[in-house]
Amino acid sequence: MPTFRSNIVVFNLIARRAFTTTSTKNMGFVEKVRLLDYWKIQDSALQSEFPRSRLVLMVDRRLLVTKDQPDVQMVELSFDDLKQRLGEYGLQFDLSNSCLLDALSTDVDMIPLFGTSIDAADPPEDSPISKKEVLKQLGNSLGGRFTDIRMAMLTMREERQRNLLAKFQSLTKWASIYRRCPKCAAALKMRSSKSGAECVTCQRVYYPTFSPVSITLITDPTNEHALLVRHRGSAGGVFTAVAGFAHSGESMAECARREIAEEVGIEVDSIRSLDMSQPWPMPDSSLMIAHVAVAKIDQKISVCPDELETAQWFTRHQVKEALTTTLADPLLKNLPRTLDDRQTLHYIPPAGAIAHQMIRQWVDGKLENHNSRI
């Protein structure tokens, strides 16, 4: 059943539609989130709003973004435009492969923003048609281009865009996995919003989950050196901060301290949380929570070979040079190719990553490392 507060919001929304002189610019944040809450749990209401919605699109897990670089943004389309364009390529969408992302203001009321994800069929092996070329043509017809989700997350400048993409990918993947009740194995009825699923037998309700991750920039007591790591299998020459998943029963500070010990084999003297976090949808949904830690620079580094290729202390000047290179080459087109050069600091993660923001603040002298001991 809808909550009382949600019913009030919906009544107000209907009134606004009836008397169009009232602008949604006067609708506050509370009204917006209560409307979203109503849409999340009321399938019939969301179904009636679907034809009025705006949508962003993924095809074969590739996101439709603007052609402009480096200011990458998701392309938003009206329901009718997207339906027509996809229909020309034999593609369809409906609520079953769409998820609710946000509520957008119009001059009259608020409309839903959906993400819709489509899997395109592969052409026959002997077909002269190239699927890659078809997707390129589709992207052009929709006013954009398709790109890898990870690259989109790393290069989008706007936090709202990155967070919406993280939500889009996370809900889409969760809805594709949660088909059976983990308790009784009966079928689950997925909400149209993809915000939850209810067991048809035991009525247990399941919600999308995410895993908390600590990401920590380690500095020395002088705050003039930072310890950065290169993950096994990552792009050559790219160094980042230490990160790892929290375990049951751990605080985030305890998680950060343990991950540092596991991955680089040193102890930290102090650690504090930064007012920074980032949803990250790959490979599974997580929330990265930023910390800064202080460790003595004379400790012997012992990397975990299963996780890392190398970990090194760098001066502020060295890290600043890598930051400058990254800003000049945000798509990492000039990555080093030789094995030795891959182990040298050339880049930090692109601007869309929380690690970039942490490292950049430290380079600019805005990240102090003093605080309480663990």
UniProtKB/Swiss-Prot annotation:
Keywords per UniProt: Hydrolase, Magnesium, Manganese, Metal-binding, NAD, Zinc
Pfam families, alphabetized: NUDIX
Cofactor: Mg(2+); Mn(2+); Zn(2+)
Cofactor annotation comment: Divalent metal cations. Binds 3 Mg(2+) or Mn(2+) ions per subunit. Binds 1 zinc ion per subunit.
Cystine bridges: none
Binding residue positions for Zn(2+): C181, C184, C199, C202
Motif (Microbody targeting signal): 367-369
SUPFAM superfamilies the record matches: Nudix
Functional summary from the UniProt entry: mRNA decapping enzyme that specifically removes the nicotinamide adenine dinucleotide (NAD) cap from a subset of mRNAs by hydrolyzing the diphosphate linkage to produce nicotinamide mononucleotide (NMN) and 5' monophosphate mRNA. The NAD-cap is present at the 5'-end of some RNAs; in contrast to the canonical N7 methylguanosine (m7G) cap, the NAD cap promotes mRNA decay. Mediates the hydrolysis of some nucleoside diphosphate derivatives.
Subunit: Homodimer.
Assigned protein family: Belongs to the Nudix hydrolase family. NudC subfamily.
Designated name of the protein: NAD-capped RNA hydrolase ndx-9
Gene transcribed to yield this protein: ndx-9
